[in-house]
Design a protein with these regions (language model features):
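Glycine-rich phosphate-binding loops of nucleotide-dependent enzymes
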Residues: 2-252
Length: 252
């Protein structure tokens, strides 16, 4: 069953097409990876999905609802969360504080309730804390929960950003170069986390990634982009053996 669908998306910058008539669908519970050389249009596509960029043509559907005109700040409320290649964390806040901020989109109490810490506000805070602690346990971040972000190794910071995305209870998780900057051991761990996110939490994942060994291990299907157009979509072995993909992406 299709959870997410892109139909005929075109994006132009100054007359240059960054994406040209791109269409694909992602099944519920799938790990779907987008690959391609630098400048292929991968980040542009993620920015269109996140509603940061406005396409000149095409539609985006999530849960069969057209979200093409949805405001960027409302995307997370629909159940779509995203991590970034360049980490977007609060350096002088703790891991716990960063994760609690990931729950702010669900805030239902007003400022007055917050100031006087009313029963409703206390109940909401308790619910937020329970969810955050679940995610901390899930990603094995207990040791770092009260540590400031600026005191953490890069690999742990990446995990914290993933955790913050999970704190929004997404149905769809967008991962932008999740293995970038990680050691081999950390990349292996990331693969296990992703499979757990898929199988245990039931979250669908769309990922941009350059590490083809990692891509082939974790992906259910792969889409290859080049110069803003789709070269191929298929299973990892199909993409690995596709002549056009080898030429464009692997230089063979």
């Amino acid at each position: 069953m299709s959870l997410f669908e892109v139909k005929n998306i075109t994006v132009s910058f100054g007359g240059v097409k960054a994406l040209n008539d791109v269409s694909f669908s992602v099944n519920k519970g799938e790990i779907f990876t987008i690959i391609g050389p630098n400048g292929a249009g991968k980040s542009t596509l993620f920015n269109v999905i996140s509603r940061i960029y406005e396409p000149s043509k095409g539609q985006i559907y999530f849960n069969e609802e057209n979200i093409s005109k949805t405001k960027p700040h409302n995307i997370s409320r629909l159940g779509i969360a995203r991590t970034f290649q360049n980490l977007e964390l609060f350096e002088n806040a703790t891991v716990l504080q960063n994760l609690l901020l990931g729950r702010h989109i669900f805030k239902k109490t007003n400022l007055l309730s917050e100031v006087f810490f009313t029963p409703k506000s206390r109940q909401q805070e308790h619910e937020y804390r329970l969810k955050v602690e679940e995610v901390i346990d899930f990603l094995d971040l207990q040791h770092y929960r009260d540590t400031l972000i600026n005191g953490l190794p890069y690999g742990v910071r990446k995990n914290v950003e993933l955790a913050r995305a999970l704190c929004t209870d997404p149905q769809l998780l967008l991962l932008d170069e999740p293995s970038s900057g990680l050691t081999n051991e950390e990349t292996i761990d990331l693969g296990f986390w992703m499979k757990d996110i898929q199988s245990i939490l039931g979250i669908t994942i769309i990922m941009i990634e350059h590490d083809m060994s990692f891509v082939n291990k974790v992906s259910d299907r792969i889409l290859a982009l080049n110069y803003g157009e789709i070269l191929a979509t298929g299973l990892p072995d199909e993409i690995k053996n596709n002549a056009d993909v080898k030429q464009a992406y692997m230089g063979e």
